[in-house]
Structures are given as structure tokens and as C-alpha cells.
Amino acid sequence: MNKNFFDAIKERRSIYAISKESPISDEKSVKIVEEVVKHVPSAFNSQTTRTVILLGESHNKLWDITMEALRKVVPEKDFSSTEEKINSFKAGHGTVLFFEDFAVVESLQKQFELYKDNFPVWALQTSGMMQFSVWTAFATEGIGASLQHYTELIDEQVKREFNIPNNWKMISQMPFGKIVKAAGEKTFNPIEDMVKVLR
């Protein structure tokens, strides 16, 4: 991972066409996630983020669960496109699940009442940095990934299936794998509408 930081940010894209292969070993993928979790900042050094890396049959099971959950809420006449989308995630090599440990958040709320309304917000900010960092680190290794949010539909069943503590709040799912098709051209709003410089 010796690329320029800004090159890495530019390279990170939502990649939906991925395969079961991976350009790097599972051990290296796990190490990337471990290093990010260890070093991404968190308010009060609270280290609230939790991750679960699903590979092989565990990865397949996640997307089977998601498919069946969606089947219950998406009209049958509209389901083919949903099925195609979920199968594209299942076609990947693995999935990283991102959680925040709200037992830690609630403990901090009790310790520091002045900031109690902020801790859930800060936890989500940490999670956002975590997701972006894993995603970008994967991109530098030639791994394609995207960020998905099926949490409300699958949270309870995923926790049962993979024995995940109830106090872990699921935030997102990141399927990843070898890139089959690159992302299309990205468009940008005028930078002057988004960045103000005052002197």
C-alpha cells in the first residue's frame, strides 16, 4: 500500500461487479481490516467499532438471508432486479460487516453526562471513517467493494446465525472481491459550492 493518499481516495469507487476470486490472500484482507480497526480514531479513544469478516459459506449465507428477507417485502413482479442485485453481492469473495458496540457507547454516556447526546453521533462518525478506510485500503490492493445497508431487514437473523452480541448495532455490509468490471465515470458538483475559504 505505497500509493499516494489522494490517488488511493480517487481509486476507491463503488464496484458492483465482483467475483469469488481475490487478488490478495484472506490473511492479508483480514490484516487490512485489523490495522484499520486499530488505528482509525474514535472519540475519547472509545474504540466502539466492531467488524465481522465473512468468507466462504458464511459470506454466501449472509446474502441468502438477505435475499429471503427481501423476498418478503418486495413485490414478486419487481423481484427479478432485486434478486440480480443480491446475487451480484453473493458473487463476491467475502463481506465485511460493520457494527458499533452500544454497550460501550452507553457506558460513556453514563460517565460523561454532559456529552451523552453526542456519543451515538460520534460512534457513527467513527464507523464512517472505518468503512471509508477499509474500502480505500481494499482499493489499493485491487479489491473491488461497495457499501450496502440492509441492516433493518437482516439484523436479528444475522446476529442469531453468526452468534453476534445484541449490543452490537449493525451499520453496514461491504461485499468485496476481484474486480470484474470497473466503475463508470464519476461526475462532480462545482467545487466552489462545496468548499468555502474565508480569510
Language model features: what each stretch is:
Residues 5-11, 16-17, 170-199:
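C-terminal helix-cap and adjacent tail motif
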Residues 61-63, 104-108:
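Short acidic/glycine-rich loop or secondary-structure boundary segments that cap or lie
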Residues 92-102:
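Active-site-adjacent structural patch at catalytic or cofactor/ligand-binding sites
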Residues 107-111, 157, 186:
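A short secondary-structure junction signal
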Residues 159-166, 182-186:
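Short proline/glycine-enriched turn/loop segments at secondary-structure junctions
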